[in-house]
């Protein structure tokens, strides 16, 4: 299983992103939609696609923005899949691999991040669970008819993507 985290504030170097014995780095790739200096992901024309342990560790972290000057993404990814950094304190799916998306504050961009995660998981032959632990606002009507809601529903139905959302921050 791959856990995709759509958020801000990822410290790619954090020890919780290794396995419980601190031997294997589990972050597969990140898409920082703010960053330049790396090529964007395939089929997209913005942001930076960073793949592989050495590239991620060299990049160090995602781009700070006004919505998260700290490490919220690292925090919620740790709850979902933290390896424990050699301690007994681990995330729920501590053996899962990870994808991170730091998305621009726009409905289209967050939906792009979901599609990117789906494509990455398919390419690797893995199931995908997407974590959304942000409570800034909702896109569109809150009755299930918004573009956002319909897109999430379709990814869930057509591609068996599981979405997990916090009940608030």
PLM regions and their residue ranges:
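Subtilisin-like serine protease catalytic core
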Residues: 1-110, 124-129, 158-160
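Substrate-binding/access-modulating region of protease and related hydrolase catalytic domains
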Residues: 83, 103-169
């Amino acid at each position: 299983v791959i856990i995709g985290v759509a958020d801000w504030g990822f410290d790619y170097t954090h020890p919780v992103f290794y396995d419980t014995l601190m031997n294997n780095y589990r972050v597969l790739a990140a898409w920082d939609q703010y960053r330049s200096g790396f090529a964007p992901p395939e089929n997209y024309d913005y942001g930076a696609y960073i793949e592989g342990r050495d590239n991620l560790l060299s990049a160090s972290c995602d781009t700070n923005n006004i919505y998260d000057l700290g490490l919220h993404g690292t925090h919620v990814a740790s709850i979902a899949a933290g390896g424990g950094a050699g301690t007994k304190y681990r995330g729920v799916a501590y053996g899962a691999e990870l994808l991170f998306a730091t998305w621009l504050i726009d409905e289209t961009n967050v939906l792009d991040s979901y599609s990117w995660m789906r494509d990455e998981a398919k390419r690797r032959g893995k199931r995908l669970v997407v974590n959304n632990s942000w409570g800034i606002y909702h896109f569109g009507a809150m009755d299930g008819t918004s573009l956002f809601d319909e897109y999430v529903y379709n990814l869930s139905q057509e591609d068996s993507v599981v979405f997990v959302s916090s009940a608030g921050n």
